[in-house]
Curated annotation (Swiss-Prot):
This protein's encoding gene: aroA
UniProtKB keywords: Amino-acid biosynthesis, Aromatic amino acid biosynthesis, Cytoplasm, Transferase
MF GO annotations: 3-phosphoshikimate 1-carboxyvinyltransferase activity
Assembly and binders: Monomer.
Family that this chain belongs to: Belongs to the EPSP synthase family.
Annotated Gene Ontology cellular component terms: cytoplasm
Full protein name: 3-phosphoshikimate 1-carboxyvinyltransferase
Enzyme superclass (EC): transferase
Lineage of source species: Bacteria, Bacillati, Bacillota, Bacilli, Bacillales
NCBIfam families in alphabetical order: aroA
Family annotation (HAMAP family): EPSP_synth
InterPro entries: Enolpyruvate_Tfrase_dom, Enolpyruvate_Tfrase_sf, EPSP_synthase, EPSP_synthase_CS, RNA3'P_cycl/enolpyr_Trfase_a/b
Binding site for 3-phosphoshikimate: K23, S24, R28, S168, Q170, D316, K343
Catalytic activity, reaction form: 3-phosphoshikimate + phosphoenolpyruvate = 5-O-(1-carboxyvinyl)-3-phosphoshikimate + phosphate
Cell location: Cytoplasm
Length: 429
């Protein structure tokens, strides 16, 4: 445990920050680069613990990967060139690595056992395992394969036409990766569009894939081709500074080179709806992904309702938006967010418990919470639940509390944003 005590601030936030590379895209760049033929180069790779688990897994399967800071070079072996690992694969805390790799490993001609830390071992895997079994996959583990560790017995896979019962880009991506192995076309249908980095990047690598936002089809592709991936800044990391600059009076912050993929920008839509002074500058397309600079100037805010199709576009930002809601006038209602119960921790519980501890007026509901705003927050102990996004939320909360906030463990921040505290200190004026 590595606690951090944060005193109340007297100033405001001013300056420019370049947030680290997008976690979702960093994971996928390693996966697709490894199963492609030829060289893939990656710039602005997220140097966090989760993404390193993905690199380590492919190194164990014989893929030459060189990492120099945030630059990565992958000498892809192609799907047929991956080798059976000599030991079990440790995915640590990374749900993305686990779920995507289950789809990939299911169709490879060897057996693999995968495991993770205590937190990951509590996260349900049947949402991926069940449809993979419909494709012919053989996956065994605790409680009928619902929890790690899992053993995947490689086999030939059938195609599938599958309606996603959950709003999960990870499940969609796992099935699309499995579809690379199957002889016929695999189709994945979703009611609400989730993040589409897998579809966008597979197209760039030469896969036979089509998508209209709700329906994605993929056919067997003999060989993906290596390419260059420039990873944009992670909007989920930028969200903490967006909220901080909105809340702290007199603040003005610029966030450089942030990914603005429309399946991820729900946070921007919601804070604008609340009355934020936020503008996008220098907008451009890089490697098929929209990026730009975000300028935020503090302003009074009003509560809103966050629900429905907005949820998958901001699922990771709900904790920090809940904090913002405590400082907005009126009531904010969050619903349809039951997916947060199966993240690194039960984030609905973690958010409501911590905000209540700080003096916020929060009523938990089955699929979200009701937050009555314009609340003075006191200090106190803040439980990270060993969840990086909850820990960073606690640090940002200290900017608007009357007394000291003690976050019980900040080591988990290394999963997605190792330099978070230093970056925040750099704009405290």
């Amino acid at each position: 445990m590595n606690p951090l005590a944060l005193q109340p601030i007297s100033g405001s936030l001013h300056g420019t920050i370049k947030v680290p590379g997008d976690k979702s895209i960093s994971h996928r760049s390693i996966i697709f680069g490894s199963i492609a033929k030829g060289t893939t180069t990656v710039t602005n790779f997220l140097d966090g613990e989760d993404c390193m688990r993905t690199i380590d897994a492919f190194k164990e399967m014989g893929v030459p990967i060189q990492k120099n800071g945030s630059n990565v070079t992958i000498e892809g072996t192609g799907l047929s060139g991956l080798m059976e690992p000599n030991k079990e694969l440790d995915f640590g805390n990374s749900g993305t690595t686990t779920r995507l790799m289950l789809g990939l490993l299911a169709g490879l001609p060897f057996n693999t056992t995968v495991y993770g830390d205590a937190s990951l071992s509590k996260r349900p895997m049947n949402r991926v395992v069940d449809p993979l079994r419909l494709m012919g996959a053989t996956i065994d583990g605790k409680e009928q394969g619902n929890y790690l560790p899992l053993t995947i017995t490689g086999t030939s896979l059938n195609s599938i036409d599958y309606d996603l019962p959950v709003k999960s880009a990870q499940v969609k991506s796992a099935l699309l990766l499995a579809g690379l192995h199957s002889e016929n076309t695999t189709i994945v249908r979703e009611k609400s569009p989730t993040r589409n980095h897998t579809e966008t990047m597979l197209q760039a690598f030469g896969a036979n894939i089509k998508s209209d936002g709700h329906t994605t089809s993929i056919s067997k592709t003999d060989d993906l081709q290596g390419c260059h991936v420039e990873v944009p800044g992670d909007i989920s990391s930028a969200a903490f500074f967006v909220v901080a600059a909105c809340m702290v009076p007199g603040s003005e912050v610029i966030l450089k080179d942030v990914g603005l993929n429309e399946t991820r920008t729900g946070i921007i839509d919601i804070v604008l709806q609340m009355g934020a002074k936020l503008t996008i500058q220098n907008e451009r397309i890089v490697g098929g992904e929209k990026i730009g600079d975000i300028l935020i100037i503090s302003s009074p805010l009003t509560g809103v309702t966050i629900e429905g199709d907005a949820i998958p576009r901001l699922i990771d930002e709900i904790p920090i938006l809940a904090l913002l809601a405590t400082q907005a006038d009126g009531t904010t209602i969050i619903k349809d967010a039951e997916e947060l119960k199966v993240k690194e921790t039960d984030r609905l519980l973690a958010v409501s418990e911590n905000l209540t501890q700080l003096g916020a007026d929060v009523t938990p509901t089955e699929d979200g919470m009701i937050i009555r705003g314009n609340t003075k927050l006191k200090g106190g102990n803040f439980k990270s639940f060993d969840d990086h996004r909850i820990a960073m939320m606690g640090i940002i909360a200290s900017l608007v509390t009357e007394d000291t906030v003690v976050v019980d463990n900040i080591d988990c921040i290394n999963i997605s944003y190792p330099n978070f505290v230093n970056d925040l200190q750099s704009i405290l004026k």
